[in-house]
Design a protein with these regions (language model features):
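Glycine-centric low-complexity repeats
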Residues: 1-417
């Protein structure tokens, strides 16, 4: 979970690997035992985005209106704004309008979603129905933008439906869907991997005659944690449906356009650095009279860098509403955004252990080699583009399908140690 101030948290460093056991010592004659290999360091924790702890109040609902003349539904109120740990409130729905004689009917607009840790959803537009004149559905409210690291944008509200009667000379125009809110960038990086454990020392050769045992290899460093992902964009609202009771040339039904999907956000935190390799154990000493010293253990390989956080996905475009005479316009998916950069590889491995001293007749053991550097972490994946909304069906002219959003770019790989 992220910190209470809404900043999210970098991953914590992994624990160090256990040291290898020492080799046994020979008594008067014989070779010393080899030291054990050091344990692997623990992986660093992944970076985390904050988790909202509450939601602000929703906006008020617009009032419905039914009149013999012009009828206009009330607009929905905007959702209250949240803060770094509180999501925005949902927008209120627009009021419905019904004209029972020869007036126009206009549905109320949906309220905008509040901005906050996560964006609030937009309110739906009010529906409109007129017996003898035009009917215009209310537009859906826009989703609120996210304002905390890794937060997701709110979904757009649906457009209101529209219906005109058989005796009406006017058109039915449904409301458009609201646009989705944008996601917010993430910043938390992955934690550093833990250091590998030290290799165990080789055992001493026999007091008089015997070779010293080889030192154990150092443990491998832990892998760095992944960066936190960027926030996704909210989906666009669907357009409302329009309908006329008969398909006369003077009466056309226009389905509402789907809303534009919100943009996904970038992951700016890097993957954590790989842990350093453990130091190789020292070789055991040879016997006092005859015996070679044990070789020092090789240093452990450094851990690989963590993967950069992935970019947030773009929100899907809303579907166009259907119409009995004419379809809607196009809906566009939101663009994906850029993935975070990969973390750097761990530092070169620790120094190898020292070779043991030789006996009166015998040579000293060779020193252990230096451990290899860790591999660079992979770049974070780019966010996927949102899908375009489908065109609504029309009995004479179908609506056009929307275009999909563009995918985000992948992050750059980290440097090797």
């Amino acid at each position: 979970m992220g910190r209470r101030d809404g900043t999210g948290g970098a991953g914590v460093k992994g624990g160090m690997g256990a040291a290898g056991g020492a080799g046994g010592n020979a008594y008067l004659f014989g070779s010393g035992g080899a030291g054990g290999q050091g344990g692997m360091g623990a992986a660093g924790a992944d970076g985390v985005n904050p988790t909202p702890t509450g939601t602000a109040d929703a906006g008020s609902t617009g009032t419905d209106q039914t009149l013999g003349g012009n009828a206009i539904g009330g607009n929905g109120g905007p959702g209250d704004a949240g803060d770094a740990m509180t999501s925005g409130g949902a927008g209120g729905s627009g009021g419905n309008a019904v004209s029972t004689v020869n007036g126009d009917a206009v549905g109320g607009e949906g309220g905008k979603g509040g901005e906050g840790a996560y964006g609030g959803a937009g309110g739906a537009g009010g529906s409109a129905a007129s017996i003898g004149n035009a009917a215009i559905g209310g537009n859906g409210g826009a989703g609120g933008n996210a304002q905390a690291p890794g937060g997701v944008g709110g979904a757009g509200g649906e457009g209101g439906d529209a219906q005109v009667g058989t005796n009406s000379p006017s058109n039915a125009e449904a409301g458009n869907g609201g646009s989705g809110g944008n996601g917010f960038d993430s910043f938390a990086s992955g934690g550093t991997g833990g250091a590998g454990g030290t290799g165990g020392a080789g055992g001493r050769g026999g007091l008089l005659i015997g070779d010293g045992g080889a030192g154990g290899a150092g443990g491998v460093g832990g892998t760095g944690g992944s960066g936190a992902p960027g926030g996704g964009g909210g989906a666009g609202g669907d357009g409302g449906a329009a309908n006329t009771d008969s398909a006369g040339s003077s009466r056309k039904a226009f389905g509402g356009d789907g809303g534009v999907g919100g943009d996904g956000a970038s992951a700016l935190g890097t993957g954590g650095e790989g842990g350093i390799g453990g130091q190789g154990g020292n070789g055991g000493a040879g016997g006092l009279l005859i015996g070679n010293g044990g070789a020092g253990g090789v240093g452990g390989t450094a851990g690989a860098g963590g993967t950069g956080g992935s970019g947030g996905a773009g929100g899907a475009g809303g579907a166009g509403g259907g119409g009995t005479n004419s379809g809607p316009g196009a809906a566009f998916g939101g663009n994906g955004n850029t993935g975070g950069n990969g973390g750097n590889g761990g530092a070169p491995g620790a120094l190898g252990g020292k070779g043991g001293s030789g006996g009166l007749i015998g040579r000293a053991g060779s020193d252990g080699g230096v451990g290899a550097g860790g591999a660079g972490g992979a770049g974070g994946a780019g966010g996927t583009g949102g899908e375009g909304g489908t065109g609504g069906d029309g009995k004479t002219t179908d609506g056009n399908p929307g275009m999909g959003g563009s995918p985000g770019s992948a992050g750059q790989p980290g440097q090797p140690g």
